[in-house]
Amino acid sequence: MKSLKGRLLFLRKFVFFSLLILLFAHGASSSSSSFNYFDKRTNGKANNELALFSPTADSPSSVDGVLELPSAENVFAESSLYNAFIVATVDGSLHSYDRITGQELWSLFTNANPGLSYTKDENSLLSSKFLSQSNFKSYNSTHGEFYSDSTLNISYLSDDDTVWFVEPIDGGILYAFNLQTGLVRLPHSIKDLVHASPIRLLNNNVFVGSKNTTLFTIDVSNGDIVSQYPSGHRYETHHSVHNLGTKRDSVPSGADSDLSFKDPSGKKLSESLDLLDDFNYQVTVSNKSFVDIARTEYFITIYSDSNVILDLVYIDWTPTKNEIMYESFHSSSFDSKLALSSYDSSLHIVDTHSKFIKQNIPLMSPAATVFDIVTLPHNKKIDKSQTPAKFPTSVLLRQPIDTYLETMFPQIARNKTEHVYINHIGNAWFAMSERHYPLVSLAPEASFLYYNGFYIPLNSIFGLHSLMATPKPFFALPGLPGYDIPSYVESEGSTKTLPSIGKKPIPLLDPNPISSTPISITFWVIMFLSVSFTIVTFFSILRIRSSEVRPLKSQKNTVSINNKIDTSKRRRKGKRRKRVSDEHSASSNFNEIESQASFEQNQTLDILSENIVEIQDKSTDPLQKSLDSSLKSHLPEATVIQNTDGSVTVNSLTVYPEVIGYGSHGTIVYRGVYEDREVAVKRVLMEFYDLASREITLLQQSDNHPNIVRYYCKQKSDQFLYIVIELCKCNLSDLIEKPIAYDDLFKSIDLVSLLYQIAFGVSHLHSLDLVHRDLKPQNILLVVNNSPNLSKTRVRALISDFGLSKKLDFNQSSLRNTTFEAAGSYGWRSPEILSGSLSQQSKEIQVKTREGRIRQASHATDIFALGCIFYYTLTGGMHPFGSHYDCEGNILKGNYCLVHLQSLGECGVLAADLIEDMIAFEPSKRPTIEVVLNHPLFWDYAKKLDFLIDVSDRFEVEERDPPSPLLQMLENNSKSVIGENWTTCLHSSLVDNLGKYRKYDGSKILDILRVLRNKRHHYQDLPESVRRVLGDLPDGFTSYFVEKFPMLLLHCYHLVKDVLYEESQFKRYLEY
């Protein structure tokens, strides 16, 4: 063994020194090689292009046939960074913000529109295969808080409609959305189409394009336009602040310097971010600095048979061509501040050194481009007395977001599926891809898949989409055949971009190709030798490890494992706590799989993610050994058999190597079979047997319920505890955020019924005095009942993850100190958990707020999380307290917004009423789970109809002249319930039928209740035309009235609950 290890050590040293030689050889070959960017035929062209740059001291020069380019050190070493950003937003405006305080300084072009703008001649004919963005099919509908007297005009899409979007970068990248194809990115930008026009495309339609460019010179200190080429309309500057701040280290108001910046997976940014500045740049606060910026308008008009069918307008903001060279050097932030645009119209200023968000600047629309303002050394020598219009003193450089993409957002860089966010502001229809705007990956997915039928609401397509890339535009869009812009078409405005500029001189000619140099031959010889010895070393390591593992196979009741735990102990002996991970290779058994739990812990299709507390290693302490021994004695060890297919059999349980999920700190979930039933198997390290047993105990107490994940059994080997639980299809987060992946499942689900199941499961836990404390979409699992005899509900919701659950003591209404503080997950924790400090002066643990008030932490914490889950489910992934970064801050402030429920009609009104109570800041004001289950949101149409008829019967006996106090309460705020006159909201045939029998007062709630009651009792006597309007009993009939008056049911419900709750006829509606 010693000789083998000696050989291994020698081989490792040899490989190490070989690699050093390899790197040296590669560097030598790189430095001695040359790059032939221009050949003799393009010599004149290259020189002409280089002549575009101003002849300054630092401009490139040609010496002895070699283009001498300045290095980054020479260009920026003595440069000064102006203390402001210039931000171009998708609504077309320009804004300037202070780099230190984030305060807006000025704004320009506030009426411009750089996104994709649509205009259409109202008199022109529009082919059915095209869609004007301003001419969608429209229907009148009443939604949310828009009552009968104020209907909301909503636009809809059909399968034949195609909607166009543009990403405001790289010449206006075009996207097309269609219900049949999803979102498709086209390979040609608007700029390409303009340069290729005129051209016939798309069923022989004629595309004619043009562009118009205006150059502005702007005083960046106040936003004044000092010159304009060509001169024309003068634009007004809106001044917010007249002078820039001068205190460099000041902290902006409201900025959170402790907020850690995280990537879309939820993990902190990599600590290996090495893209730091090499120089200290001075931030200038001078009063005057001038920059050039170009505004280019691209116009495309589409003709069909001489008729204009669509006009597209795209406006782009760019620096001048003189600044192209400087942009190529701009590879990192000068002052370590990177401005990232978000989908929610905010600009996050991130410190690239500390990886913290320093500022969050709210904008009126998302930022399209962010420019740094840099004054170069040679510009400092300009005579200030000269005309500023002729001598801009600074240059605009786009912020180098691409440089930081892979380091700060590794998942986006590695993700094979790109995501794109689409939305519109006014007449600007824009797209933002996560590769250009990384923070849009946090946006909710578009909810158009929630809708069935030929028409869907237009606003349901706005959100995050998985990009369906296609090499040919319009290839799969209905009625739009593929096309190619001919390669021989070259516009006179097309330009050749300079090659990537490095720090070394670039010769114009390359006399010696790299492949012929002697150093290149040496390089490949050394590479061959290094690879050969690396292969030998690899197989030597395998031989040594196999010889160490072989004796374990003879031990009884063990599985042959090559685990890192023992080796880690020898290397780090004496450490009491550390993380444990297992290794897995393609050829080894599943026990060697490395545990890499993600932030959300639910990245697979079939998952069961359960949190287990932090892992502790076995200690050499005698007391710890005694404890381990006593824990293992709780359950006799089972016979473990290693099967040839890689699976493991433990008694009647077979565990397969297929990983379906990861838990916290080394817990792995595998697919398995238990007594001919497919199951999920959690493998837990034996060091945590006691903690896992507590979770098993809670599962055993609570799993006798259709909406609690089912526990089957536990098995134990000498190293692991196997917990066997129900196998599920996915979790609620997967279903809502990835509806395309679960299309069949999604279409079969009634979301309101699903929410009732979740609440029903929570009610079971609360009836057992259990507080879950970690309710979130990732812990709501979904299982499909394939047999129709099992249940009327095809999809069942199951509550899982009891790792943080706590059983309350008898008559205890709150939680223990040791388990309360860290409970819950980000974004789903109640305000009392986030802001409270625990008082230990009472047996019932109390929460003291920052204002000194005392609150109890109890079942209300689950109700709060459940309210957030309700909103998340109904709105397609939205959160009532805002975006990821602002969520918990808004929870602490009690700031919420339920506006996205308005599009759900009467269901949205009921949901908003319930959710608003569930997420109340004070726990005592939140409803119990029994009240939640009895809310009208979960009533079927028959129950709603019965309730309204009972209310009508009850109030008919009240004195009307003068009205009784109870009747006055019913009529209170009637305009917000039924409008000025409810008769104007009903169908004319129904109103005519009403007038034949008696008179009704259109301003009274009691009268509309009487109409509903009378027409229900005399439904069979109604004319056929009126019955068709009202629909069938009870669903169609009830739906007609509650959709016309969405506040009517809720108004009556609150009156009965507050005043008439003791009357017997209403108890069945209020008691669970």
Curated annotation (Swiss-Prot):
Q: Which residues lie on this side of the membrane: Lumenal?
A: 31-518
Question: What domain of life?
Answer: Eukaryota
List, separated by semicolons, the cofactors it needs: Mg(2+)
Q: What happens when the gene is disrupted?
A: Impairs ER stress-induced ER-phagy.
Residues at the active site: D774 (proton acceptor)
Where, in residue ranges, is this chain on the Cytoplasmic side?
540-1072
Question: What does this gene product do?
Answer: Endoplasmic reticulum (ER) membrane-resident kinase/endoribonuclease involved in unfolded protein response (UPR). Initiates the selective decay of a subset of ER-localized-mRNAs that is required to survive ER stress. Rather than relying on a transcriptional program to up-regulate genes that enhance ER protein folding capacity as in S.cerevisiae, S.pombe cells reduce the amount of specific proteins entering the organelle by decreasing the level of ER-targeted mRNAs using ire1-dependent mRNA degradation.
Protein name (record): Sensor for unfolded proteins in the ER ire1
**What organism does this protein naturally occur in?**
Schizosaccharomyces pombe (strain 972 / ATCC 24843) (Fission yeast)
Taxonomy-wise, where does this protein's organism fall, top ranks first? Eukaryota, Fungi, Dikarya, Ascomycota, Taphrinomycotina
